[in-house]
UniProtKB/Swiss-Prot annotation:
Extra facts: Thiocyanate (SCN(-)) and hypothiocyanite (OSCN(-)) are bound in the distal heme cavity. The iodide ion (I(-)) occupies a position which is stabilized by the interactions with heme moiety, His-226, Arg-372 and Glu-375. Hydrogen peroxide is held between the heme iron and His-226.
UniProt-annotated binding residues for Ca(2+): D227, T301, F303, D305, S307
Enzymatic reactions: 2 a phenolic donor + H2O2 = 2 a phenolic radical donor + 2 H2O; iodide + H2O2 = hypoiodite + H2O
EC number: 1.11.1.7
Name of the protein described by the UniProt record: Lactoperoxidase
Molecular function terms from GO: calcium ion binding; heme binding; lactoperoxidase activity; peroxidase activity; thiocyanate peroxidase activity
Alphabetized InterPro entries for the sequence: Haem_peroxidase_animal, Haem_peroxidase_sf, Haem_peroxidase_sf_animal
Modified residues (Phosphoserine): S315
Transmembrane domains' residue ranges: none
Family according to the record: Belongs to the peroxidase family. XPO subfamily.
Cofactor(s) essential for the protein: Ca(2+); heme b
GO BP term, pick one: antibacterial humoral response
One of the Pfam families matching this protein, by short name: An_peroxidase
Protein species of origin: Bubalus bubalis (Domestic water buffalo)
Length: 712
């Protein structure tokens, strides 16, 4: 467990938020001392990482993995991400050890040579992981080299950006709620599960659907989110605190921060005292070390670049391709086909948790550019559509340009698919999320600006979780007449987690895609926030295991990430900052909800950003309140304007290519990549069959003729 240094003299001499930027302020820790400390910590952390990987493989090889183990499969860091997180953990543990040891001999000046420490750990300054070719017309897989002045800006496996300084209990890494007697702004923070029970939960599913948004609207939000950010969990770095202690005995310590159940919680009878919770992976601090507060990693590129299709690391990108073909194709499933159309390939690295959902079918999880692709089957369906579209584009481009080799075809198809995702998001999705606030936060495009920081902010990873309020309790599968498909046409949401067999063995993606088009999202309601399917049964695909609470996880994660409170973000966005119950009632326009929040948090200053932002009434024609409109709008504007390869930036595509791209629609993508023949023109709006549906023959096709090379 973290032990907060309590020497008054130390606290008077150096704050935890600011450490001088000098390479060697003092010689309290010699190079030898640093080297010795780092060596010892590396042994400890490396063992923890190895033990964790071994344990995960062993438990998933059993016939009964726990909910935590299923979750861990997708939140488990891999590749370069794992290395970056391991270095971050070694740095932090070494810093704690050196600070503790050096203060014993030099209380008046305990500063460390942080540059030497970073070098010894293997951190160093952020540099591109690939060689930059400034003349390349294509993005790198890692996101490096986009900004020529700062090539690592927006790249994968770097820290999430901070728009406001982190707020931790100890100023460095401990989340609020870690120490029972510690307060925040004079008040103890409420249990995350208690907030979920009293504010987020509801029982009656009647009247919760959004009469103006399709289910695809919800699903596209998850696609965009997975393209932009992913913060895997870290490992326990101490021998004193095992994952078993965390999961089975709720013993808090190291990077275990269990979500405790309040009194009278029904889960106390079935799940013990808590839900296990492991803290997010973090990276080394970077020069000039103005802050040593823990900074969480973004394992994927910050750009809206279809990284969830192609990956954010070269090794994964290569694994996803069909390199035996000269057509620039992505690899597809060789064991199963969807009536002649391709599925995502299986991730055949054993073990696969998806196999345990139906032990008779034993269908593995899918392999995609994002490891979360099999988390739920609507997400897997969307991934499948994007994979098919890449291969369709590559084949069509080959017809136009027979002389193009596989690499050229792959890169051009990847470039076009990335543009599709950008266009659909900014033209079709964001305007009906931000509503009347769209033009305020995302004005018309003025071109690339290399001074704009495109990195995903830490707060955005919580703001964009508004989509959890849009998930309905059931998912429907529909036939070619948009009527219920089969005897199990409507499935409870919780049965669809990791459920790849429902796609492979039970109908393919067409019935699910029709459900996305013709069924509705859930409407965010101040009295009915998150369905019980997510609030009590998250990652509970079978009755044999207990589900998690996504709302409580979101709240605990806010604290894990050191998120400033509700009013800090209201101030950041230029909005009023309510200080009293009456003030909060005015902002929320809901006396009952305001009182519930004040009873729990005591002050609006302490309200966690996820619940505070989502509690606000929605802006006109939008699906978020003023605070989330600000945070989301600001982030998407920076993603667009700070991207040198943005589809509208002159030189990325020709004028004729841009004209062609603008005619693309998600409905056309479905027509081209499924057996579906009837689609709505506005796929994110709520649509009723047959009134709002048209034949695919009337939907504009993408004209690829502007991509014909002059060399033909």
């Amino acid at each position: 467990m973290w032990v907060c240094l309590q020497l008054p003299v130390f606290l008077a001499s150096v704050t935890l938020f600011e450490v001088a930027a000098s390479d060697t302020i003092a010689q309290a820790a010699s190079t030898t001392t640093i080297s010795d400390a780092v060596s010892k910590v590396k042994i400890q952390v490396n063992k923890a990482f190895l033990d964790s990987r071994t344990r995960l493989k062993t438990t998933l090889s059993s016939e009964a993995p726990t909910t935590q183990q299923l979750s861990e499969y997708f939140k488990h860091a891999k590749g370069q991400t794992r290395t970056a997180i391991r270095n971050g953990q070694v740095w932090e543990e070494s810093f704690k050890r050196l600070r503790r040891d050096t203060t014993l001999t030099n209380v008046t000046d305990p500063s460390l040579d942080l540059t030497a420490l970073s070098w010894e750990v293997g951190c160093g300054a952020p540099v591109p992981l690939v060689k930059c070719d400034e003349n390349s017309p294509y993005r790198t897989i890692t996101g490096d080299c986009n900004n020529r002045r700062s090539p690592a800006l927006g790249a994968a496996n770097r820290a999430l950006a901070r728009w406001l300084p982190a707020e931790y209990e100890d100023g460095l890494a401990l989340p609020f709620g870690w120490t029972q007697r510690k307060t925040r702004n004079g008040f103890r923070v409420p249990l995350a599960r208690e907030v979920s029970n009293k504010i987020v939960g509801y029982l009656d599913e009647e009247g919760v659907l959004d009469q103006n948004r399709s289910l695809l609207f919800m699903q596209w939000g998850q696609i965009v989110d997975h393209d932009l950010d992913f913060a895997p969990e870290t490992e326990l770095g101490s021998n004193e605190h095992s994952k078993t202690q965390c999961e089975e005995y709720c013993i808090q310590g190291d990077n275990c921060f269990p979500i405790m159940f309040p009194k009278n919680d029904p889960k106390l009878k079935t799940q013990g005292k808590c839900m296990p919770f492991f803290r997010a992976g973090f990276v080394c601090p970077t020069p000039p070390y103005q802050s040593l507060a823990r900074e969480q990693i973004n394992a994927v590129t910050s750009f809206l670049d279809a990284s969830l299709v192609y990956g954010s690391e070269p090794s994964l990108a290569s694994r996803l391709r069909n390199l035996s073909s000269p057509l620039g194709l992505m690899a597809v499933n060789q064991e199963a086909w969807d009536h002649g159309l391709a599925y995502l390939p299986f991730n055949n690295k054993k073990p696969s948790p998806c196999e345990f959902i139906n032990t008779t079918a034993r269908v593995p999880c899918f392999l995609a550019g994002d490891f979360r692709a099999s988390e739920q089957i609507l997400l897997a369906t969307a991934h499948t559509l994007l994979l098919r579209e890449h291969n369709r584009l590559a084949r069509e481009l080959k017809k136009l340009n027979p002389h193009w080799n596989g690499e050229k075809l792959y890169q051009e198809a990847r470039k076009i698919l990335g543009a599709f995702i950008q266009i659909i998001t900014f033209r079709d999705y964001l305007p009906i999320v931000l509503g009347s606030e769209m033009q305020k936060w995302i004005p018309p495009y003025q071109g690339y600006n290399n001074s704009v920081d495109p990195r995903i902010s830490n707060v955005f990873t919580f703001a964009f979780r508004f989509g959890h309020m849009e998930v309905p309790s059931t998912v429907s599968r529909l036939d070619e007449n948009y009527q219920p498909w089969g005897p199990e046409a409507e499935l409870p949401l919780h049965t669809l987690f990791f459920n790849t067999w429902r796609i492979i063995k039970d109908g393919g993606i067409d019935p699910l895609t029709r459900g996305l088009l013709a069924k509705k999202s859930k409407l965010m309601n101040q009295d009915k926030m998150v369905t019980s399917e997510l609030r009590n049964k998250l990652f509970q695909p079978t009755h044999k295991i207990h589900g998690f609470d996504l709302a409580a996880i979101n709240l605990q994660r806010c604290r894990d990430h050191g998120m400033p409170g509700y009013n800090s973000w209201r101030g950041f966005c230029g909005l009023s900052q309510p200080k009293t119950l009456k003030g909060l009632q005015t902002v929320l326009k809901n006396k009952i909800l305001a009182k519930k929040l004040m009873d729990l948090y005591k002050t609006p200053d302490n309200i966690d950003i996820w619940i505070g932002g989502n509690a606000e009434p929605m802006v006109e024609r939008g699906r978020v309140g003023p605070l989330l409109a600000c945070l989301l709008g600001r982030q998407f504007q920076q993603i667009r304007d700070g991207d040198r390869f943005w589809w509208e930036n002159p030189g990325v595509f020709t004028e004729k290519q841009r004209d062609s791209l603008q005619k693309f629609s998600f409905s056309r993508l479905i027509c081209d990549n499924t057996h579906i023949t009837k689609v709505p023109l506005h796929a994110f709006q709520a649509n009723n069959y047959p009134h709002d549906f048209v034949d695919c023959s009337t939907v504009d096709k993408l004209d690829l003729s502007p991509w014909a090379s002059r060399e033909n």
